């Protein structure tokens, strides 16, 4: 029996994602022994420094140590949340498989009487860790108090038990993967709040010359998800932005047409830019790049740079 080592961060969400991946791979390769190895990243060790790291252009704080282990041959496959992965991979590595996306949307969880974004009273205190969500909420509901809230899912949910927060906004996928879907009060429609590029999708990364591992992970590759997230990530790359920028993107496929929406907002909520394009899914990368160019022409770069000052 051959052994394949799968690397991941050690958080509850990362482990839940990786166990899901391993279960799918085991269905395809029953004679293979998959072993999970947890790896601590810079983002895990120093969450307080994330904003300053982003300002310095460091885009690999959730993945670098895992990619180093992959390059060194200590692991064979890396499992990442796609939205945390920089748009360019280190030389010698590639995204070899993208499984079917779970749910790209953001969700709201609130105290009694505050279960929907529309129901939040003026002055309600809303916690989130994402600059994208902060920018959106300040633009959409300038009457709310938008507060920083970091930590894992359990930490954020526990914050609702304190007087400091009336509601929190976070990604649906994390709650679904950790079997806490029942805690969700409202799924926020992407027509209102565009998710982060790649949100809800996973990336399985391998060494580019490791044909065996590439074959193993490609067995659970989902082409439709790949087309959608490729458009979203090319949009992000075209803007020259990273995962901590106030940027949203969401691609949909219907009747053979891929539609991509992009959003960039000022962190204080004073300005937003939103645009849409559509075309052949086979041209998903070009669609993302074209939409980025369109929005750069409308001043998107200035909003992104201002958010990192």
Curated annotation (Swiss-Prot):
Comment on bound cofactor: Binds 1 dipyrromethane group covalently.
Of the GO CC terms on this record, one is:
cytoplasm
Cofactor field: dipyrromethane
Q: Which residues carry this modification: S-(dipyrrolylmethanemethyl)cysteine?
A: 243
Among the GO biological process terms of this entry, one is:
protoporphyrinogen IX biosynthetic process
Enzyme Commission (EC) number:
2.5.1.61
Q: Which Pfam families match?
A: Porphobil_deam (PF01379), Porphobil_deamC (PF03900)
**Keyword annotations for this protein?**
Porphyrin biosynthesis, Transferase
Q: Pathway membership of this protein? A: Porphyrin-containing compound metabolism; protoporphyrin-IX biosynthesis; coproporphyrinogen-III from 5-aminolevulinate: step 2/4
> Where does the record locate the signal sequence feature?
none
Q: Could you state a single Gene Ontology molecular function term?
A: hydroxymethylbilane synthase activity
The reactions it catalyses are: 4 porphobilinogen + H2O = hydroxymethylbilane + 4 NH4(+)
Q: Which PROSITE patterns does the record associate with it?
A: PORPHOBILINOGEN_DEAM
Q: What does this protein do?
A: Tetrapolymerization of the monopyrrole PBG into the hydroxymethylbilane pre-uroporphyrinogen in several discrete steps.
> Which additional comment does the entry carry?
The porphobilinogen subunits are added to the dipyrromethane group.
Q: Which family does it belong to?
A: Belongs to the HMBS family.
HAMAP family, alphabetized = Porphobil_deam
Self-association and partners: Monomer.
- Recorded protein name is Porphobilinogen deaminase
This protein's gene is called hemC
């Amino acid at each position: 029996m051959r052994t394949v080592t799968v690397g991941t961060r050690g958080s509850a969400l990362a482990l839940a994602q990786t166990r899901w991946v391993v279960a799918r791979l085991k269905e395809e390769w029953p004679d293979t022994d998959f072993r999970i190895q947890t790896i601590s990243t810079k983002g895990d060790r120093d969450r307080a420094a994330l904003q300053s790291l982003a300002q310095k252009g460091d885009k690999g704080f959730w993945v670098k140590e895992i990619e180093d282990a992959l390059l060194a041959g200590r692991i064979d496959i890396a499992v990442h949340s796609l939205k945390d992965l920089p748009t360019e991979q280190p030389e010698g590595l590639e995204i070899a498989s993208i499984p079917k996306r779970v749910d790209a949307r953001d969700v709201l969880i609130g105290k009694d009487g505050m279960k929907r974004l529309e129901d939040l009273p003026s002055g309600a205190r809303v916690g989130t860790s994402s600059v994208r969500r902060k920018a959106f909420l300040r633009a959409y509901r300038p009457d709310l108090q938008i507060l920083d809230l970091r930590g894992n899912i359990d930490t954020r949910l526990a914050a609702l038990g304190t007087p400091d927060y009336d509601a929190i906004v976070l990604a649906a996928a994390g709650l679904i993967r950790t079997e806490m879907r029942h805690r969700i009060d409202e799924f926020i429609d992407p027509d209102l709040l565009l998710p982060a590029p790649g949100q809800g999708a996973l990336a399985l990364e391998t060494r580019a010359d490791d044909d065996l591992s590439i074959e193993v992970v490609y067995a659970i590759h989902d082409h439709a998800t790949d087309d959608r997230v490729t458009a979203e990530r090319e949009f992000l790359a075209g803007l020259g932005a990273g995962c901590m920028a106030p940027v949203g993107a969401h691609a949909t496929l219907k009747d053979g047409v891929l539609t991509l929406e992009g959003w960039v907002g000022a962190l204080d909520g004073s300005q937003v830019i939103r645009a849409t394009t559509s075309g052949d899914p086979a041209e998903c990368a070009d669609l993302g790049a074209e939409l980025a160019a369109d929005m750069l022409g409308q001043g998107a770069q200035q909003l992104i740079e201002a958010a990192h000052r």
